[in-house]
Structures are given as structure tokens and as C-alpha cells.
Amino acid sequence: MVPLLAGVSGLSSCKKVEKNEEVTVAQASASSDAISAEDDAFLADLERRCYRYFEETADPDTGLIADRWKADGSDTWDTAGIAATGFGLTGHAIAVKRGWITEDEGIARSRKVLLFMRDKVEHKRGFYYQFINRSTGEREPNSPASTIDNALFVVGALTTAEAFPDSDIPAIANEIYNRMDWAWMLDGNDFLQYGWKPEEGFLKAEWKTYCEHMVLLLLAVGAEKNPIPPACWDAWERGPLLEFQGEKFAHYPPLFIHQYSQAYFDFQNYKDKHLDYWRNSQLATLAQIDYMKRLAEAYPDQMGHYSDDLWGLTASDGPDGYKDWGAPYKDPRLRPWRGVDGTVVPSAPGGSLAICLEPSIHTLRVQKERFGDKVYGRYGFANAHNPRTGWVSQYCLAIDTGITLLMAENTRSGYVWNTFMKHPAAVRAFERAGFKNIQKPNK
């Protein structure tokens, strides 16, 4: 079992995932050096279960992925998410690499989705609606054309373009990407909008501070058609700031904020003039573990189980509905924010596997071993559970299952990074945004 971590040792343990500053991203997460055979076997099983979600919830005709599904596989959910479908596309590429499906099957599954999205699904200047009917592609009521969800779909499409270069997938994926009017989505200023609705126009919110939007901005800056100016990358605030063990980091409490962009873009070996985004995600993860342990001391009856063994807060289901919970918060007072009630969300450490390996894999293995099939089943981990009350979500959510799949694979091989970063959009984005390769050359 992975040893418990605390204090400065926790910081160095996060760096272990990099292993050697002189190797590639793929080598930086290779299982032969970074993880034990037992941990690799655990991740292999977790990955395969996670991918099963994207196999079984894909509509047979459209390939669109259900936004959520019963953890026991008994559901028939009609709503697809475009972000969910983007994770599914990346999952198809991983499945081929791992030998779960053939290359022909991976190409066929990806082509089905991409052709349907290109030819059948309504869009506004290239931007799709966040939630659509899984079988028809029609917009779900009141669903916006969400920019971040579009980015998560497109980055999945571009990953398949590099995974299957000898097929027609690259041409289809690039058609979808190139018709997106990124400049229009600025609405005349330096910040991309959250989205657009036909009933009201642009949503009354912009991407102006540190959040999960880095993948969105970089795709917009790196676009071949209708890109936004590189100055837009510099315009947003790298804050607000918190401090953990003497290091400042830009924060937002739910951990998915620090994981989605990092699953695709290589922030380990490339840095800009503003911030070390990889280190920032490590600090955010470790600060959350520390905060949850202090919550356990302050609220032992409700949260006494929070520990190195049981931690993880990110947006998820809760007993009373969907919650955007996380930790820590800007206010220095130690208290449970946003209704935090002792719930543990496995996708929080799941999405941090490649960022902070040891504490993340430790809690996931503990959760599987301690609670068994109550929390670990057909699609991997249930979306959330509360060890104190015994509540367990009946559902798995596609985006949470997806980030766990991607980061488990990045931990083992670096495959998602190395595949996506070959795409010209990724290369252009880093060049235009001023990222420099800090990787030392091989000797």
C-alpha cells in the first residue's frame, strides 16, 4: 500500500510522478518507475471499468454519451453531454491502445460520433449546446451553447485525429474545429463568454479568473480559423491566490478545475510567463487534503473520517442533489462550505492521479478495499459516497468517470498528453500563448 503523506513529504511525493526531468511526458508517468506492479494492476482494472461506461452508454446510432447512468448499468438516460462525448472520444483512443477494442472498432466508434455531430447536430457558429438528446441530437430545454463543454468535446475530437491519422477522422475533426467562430464568442472584449442561448444571447459571465477554462482559451488561441488574439491568454487573472506550505497558488475549490486542462495539455514540460500550471494543480490537490484533515479535527462527528485514507471534493452528486463542493476556500475560517457534509468524491483523487500520484492512488485503493462493491462496480467508482452515513450515489457521471480514465492512462503511459500534443492546434496554441519548453534534452 502507498504510504501515508503529510507536510513537505506530500509535496515531494507529487513530484515523483515526473520521476526524471530529462525524460518525455510518456516516460514521466511510466508505470515501470513511477508505480508498483500492484498499483498498476489496480489502475488497469479501474481504467477498463471506466471505459465500459463509454461503451455501454453510447447511443447505438449516434455514439453520443449519456451524461449520467446508473452505476449498476440498469439505466436508460436520454440526455447526452457534449463534454461527456469528448471524454468518450478520448476513451476510444485509449481503448485501442490498451487492446480492449480493435483499431477498426475505435475508428468506427469515433467516426460515428463525429459524423453525427458534424452533419446532424444543431450549432450556433460552430458551438453546440451543452446537453442534447442522446438519440436525436436535439437541444435539451434551456441548454446553453457552453464554451467549456464545447472545448472538452473538441479536444477529444482532436485527440482521436492524432490517434487515427490514417483514417478520415482527422479531416472530420478538423472540419468541426475550423467552423467554430471563437472570435465571435469574445463578444467584443478580451474574455471568452461562458456561452450563448437563443433566448437571451450571450450568458452574463466571462472567463476572467483562474478556472478550468485553460483548455478552452488555448484551443481558441490555437485555432486555424477564427482564432482569438494571443493577448486574450494574458488578459485573465491568475487568481485569487491561496498559500500552502509557503507556496502561493491560484485556486478554485473543486478539484476538477485543476484537472481538465491538465489532462490534455503538457503543462509539466511547457510553461508561460505567468504561472507554473502543473505545480499549481499539485498545490491545489495537497492543500485540499490538508484542509479536509483539519475539517476532520474541527468536526469529528460529521467529518472525522476525512484523512489521508479518505479524501476528495469536487463537483458531484450529493444526497440532496448536485453540489459544486470543494476545498479549500478563500475565507481562512475553517468550516464546511457549500454544504460539505462528509461526502467523499472518488473522481477528485481520480483526476489527480497523474498530478499527485501517491496520495491519490492511496485513497482510491483504500476506498475500494474498505467499501468494496458498495462504491466500486461496473464503471469503476460510484460518483460519490459518505462513509459516515452510508449514503452512496446510485449514479456514475460521464465527466467524472472520464477524467479518472484519462488521468489513470496518463499516469501509466502519458498517452493522452503525447497524442493530443502532436496536433497542430496544440502546437500553435503553445507557440502563440508564449509557452516555452523547459524540458532538459536527453543526454
Predicted regions and their residues:
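N-terminal export leaders
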Residues: 1-2, 404
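C-terminal motif of bacterial Sec signal peptides marking the signal peptidase cleavage site
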Residues: 10-13
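Bacterial signal peptide processing site
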Residues: 15-17
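Gram-negative bacterial Sec-dependent N-terminal signal peptides
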Residues: 2-8
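Ser/Thr/Asn(+Pro)-rich, low-complexity disordered segments
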Residues: 23-443
